[in-house]
Amino acid sequence: MGFKCGIIGLPNVGKSTLFNLLTKGNSAVANFPFCTIKPNIGIVPVIDERINNLNQIVSPQKTVNAFIEFIDIAGLVKGASQGEGLGNQFLGNIRDVHAIAHVVRCFKDDNITHIYNQVQPIKDIDIINSELILSDFDLCEKTILKLQKKTLLKNKETQEKINTLKKCLNHLKQFFMLKTLNLNKTEKQLISYLRFLTLKPTMYIANINEEKESYYFLDKLNEIAKKEGSIVIPIHANLELDLVKMSDEEKKSFMKLFNIKTLGLNSIISSGYHLLNLITFFTVGDKEIRAWAIPNGSTSIEAAHKIHSDFSKGFIRAQIIKYVDFITYKSEAKIKEMGKFRTEGKQYYIQDGDIIHFLFNV
């Protein structure tokens, strides 16, 4: 299973430009709404310096990074939850992702139309978030009615679901996102199958330019994100798209000339990884070094299954080397000599950076 991050926002805010930047592809970028009708899916590698360091020691035939799927979802409009602008289809696409990258236009440009004829980032956010809230409200209300019709109403879990959903419904009724509702772990598990849109972890991508007004908009965006526990990543999407096309030498010179210290692109990828609460483990061999993305809190049996179902079915044990030990001692023999080689069972919790060799028998 790939971990999916959906790129959403109003039409003409820079979603497809961002998608092109992430994938270095050529998704159609057009100055009119609904240019992207079917979601474009891009497999984006997660840049990790550790895999480069391992590569220098082992010199394998092949190196494979962990990845995230970014999905460019067509622009939403006011009334999407009622079907406006193919809204139901697009909202359904969002429900399938694990996290959201909400692109917000924070620049003025007379050559790029705004669907509501005025650049107002805060209002734009309200439009999108309101549609997500209304969609969740509708789903929540229908699910409560469905559960109440069940003959097994005395079932404890069903009643707990109803109680939790009523709590959610009341919060949504006040036009609050569910991520701002204080739900405990059990309550979240009870309703997880519904994949509520306003519970999904979100990062706001502020598409800026070099004008001062962009930074005024950016400050306002940060205020909203802070209230709901989201993050904001500023990016000059068109500028960075030009940078992607340059050679490394040209890129360095350009960044130095315009005093660009870090690229928003890298922040988006790493933040997507963080939003999805993922960690990385490595498999290391002469043929291949591979980084694997798994949810934080995964056990060794779950990590084994990530590689292949046979690994988990016939699991015997996992041999663990810490990344820092591998980099320090550079050979398995030396690692064993220093007492840094460990064997773990099925319920060992994988730590970020673990290098694992699975022993199994099918």
From Swiss-Prot:
Transmembrane segments: none annotated. ATP binds at residues 12-17. Mg(2+) binds at residues 16, 36. It comes from the Bacteria. InterPro entries: ATPase_YchF/OLA1 (IPR004396), Beta-grasp_dom_sf (IPR012675), G_OBG (IPR031167), GTP-bd (IPR006073), P-loop_NTPase (IPR027417), TGS (IPR004095), TGS-like (IPR012676), TGS-like_dom_sf (IPR023192). The keyword Magnesium applies. Keywords: ATP-binding, Magnesium, Metal-binding, Nucleotide-binding. GO terms for molecular function: ATP binding; ATP hydrolysis activity; GTP binding; metal ion binding; ribosomal large subunit binding. Its cofactor is Mg(2+). CDD domains: TGS_YchF_OLA1, YchF. GO terms for cellular component: cytoplasm. Residues 277-360 form the TGS domain. PANTHER family: OBG GTPASE FAMILY, OBG-TYPE G DOMAIN-CONTAINING PROTEIN. ATPase that binds to both the 70S ribosome and the 50S ribosomal subunit in a nucleotide-independent manner. Belongs to the TRAFAC class OBG-HflX-like GTPase superfamily. OBG GTPase family. YchF/OLA1 subfamily. This is Ribosome-binding ATPase YchF. It comes from Buchnera aphidicola subsp. Acyrthosiphon pisum (strain APS) (Acyrthosiphon pisum symbiotic bacterium). The gene is ychF.
